[in-house]
């Protein structure tokens, strides 16, 4: 057995133990492991499988998010600052062992930022793929960070990607069908400068999870886990 394999097995053992200590359902853990067995990442995307520096603690939220993703749903994490939205998103991608694509939304985000843009190469016009298409093809987990910072007409291009169609139609190019393992995790803050109200058509394409503020015990767990990682 190679040292890399031994290290991977040790990491897996630690992850399962941490989830069990939080009281995560054994049935959910079994389904999670089955998902990982059925959806091999492949060497090409392995470098995007990034182990988070900070683990996420919160049994109810973790169970809801994992169960939704296992059911093929996309997840929208809502809450104020410092509630662990991005930490949870990164941990979910790692637990499912999927390549991660972090996509930060802002007021100037448009369809070309997300899907791609035309470029001239080898004497022909080709599509320079954006992160959404790359994520779709590799079976990645796309983290749509602060999705409510962008204008609604900019994110409407994602409707067919996020609903039952699970596809991306780019005019002039082939239709991209999402890899079965592809999921999207949105994060959004409420009521901060520059944020916008998401329209119902977009929100309906996610399972919405409201993030609670961490209590003292959760903060202590994070601190202890961070010390062990060093």
Predicted feature residues:
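AAA+ P-loop NTPase catalytic core and its hallmark functional loops
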Residues: 2-228
């Amino acid at each position: 057995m190679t040292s890399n394999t031994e290290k991977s097995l040790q990491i897996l053992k630690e992850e399962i133990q941490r989830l069990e200590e939080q009281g995560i359902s054994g049935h959910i853990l079994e389904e999670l492991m089955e998902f990982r067995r059925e959806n091999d990442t492949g060497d090409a995307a392995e470098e995007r499988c990034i182990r988070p520096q900070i683990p996420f603690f919160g049994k109810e939220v973790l169970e809801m998010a994992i169960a939704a993703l296992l059911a093929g749903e996309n997840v929208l994490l809502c809450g104020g600052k410092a509630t662990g939205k991005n930490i949870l998103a990164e941990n979910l991608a790692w637990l499912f062992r999927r390549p991660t694509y972090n996509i930060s939304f802002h007021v100037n985000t448009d369809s070309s930022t997300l899907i791609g843009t035309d470029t001239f190469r080898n004497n022909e016009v080709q599509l320079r793929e954006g992160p959404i298409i790359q994520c779709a093809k590799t079976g990645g987990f796309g983290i749509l960070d602060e999705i409510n910072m962008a204008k609604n007409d900019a994110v409407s291009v994602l409707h067919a990607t996020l609903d039952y169609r699970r596809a991306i139609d780019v005019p002039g190019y082939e239709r991209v069908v999402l890899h079965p393992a592809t999921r999207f995790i949105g994060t959004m803050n409420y009521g901060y400068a520059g944020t916008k109200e998401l329209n119902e058509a977009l929100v309906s394409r996610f399972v919405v999870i409201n993030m609670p503020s961490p209590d003292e015990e959760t903060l202590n767990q994070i601190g202890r886990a961070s010390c062990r990682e060093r």
